[in-house]
């Protein structure tokens, strides 16, 4: 598992983020405070406070480098 911080501060970013990760057959969780939601759920993402950075847990072993490259626009360095 790999954890990165991401920013999803607009509706367009949320839609494109979900479209990107649904291409992968791995589990992705978003953690904000005490809430953990499925990152592939648009409704779940909108239940979080999107004004703050969110932790993304990526449960993937094989394609981790590829996934991180695709998610680069959302990752906070």
Locate each region found by the language model.
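Intrinsically disordered regulatory regions flanking bHLH/HLH domains
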Residues: 3, 13, 23, 63-66
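Amphipathic alpha-helical interaction surfaces in cytosolic regulatory modules
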Residues: 11-27, 35-50
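C-terminal structural segments of small proteins and small subunits
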Residues: 49-77
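Electropositive phosphate-/nucleotide-binding environments in soluble metabolic enzymes
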Residues: 8-11, 61
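N-terminal intrinsically disordered, cationic/polar leader segments
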Residues: 4, 18-22, 29, 57, ...
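Short glycine-/aliphatic-rich beta-strand segments at the starts of folded cytosolic domains
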Residues: 1-7
């Amino acid at each position: 598992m790999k954890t990165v911080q991401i920013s999803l501060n607009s509706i367009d970013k949320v839609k494109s983020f979900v479209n990107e990760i649904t291409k992968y057959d791995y589990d992705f969780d978003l953690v904000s405070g005490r809430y953990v939601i499925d990152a592939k759920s648009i409704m779940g993402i909108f239940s979080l406070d999107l004004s703050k950075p969110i932790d993304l847990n990526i449960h993937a072993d094989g394609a981790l480098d590829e996934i991180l490259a695709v998610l680069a626009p959302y990752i906070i360095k």
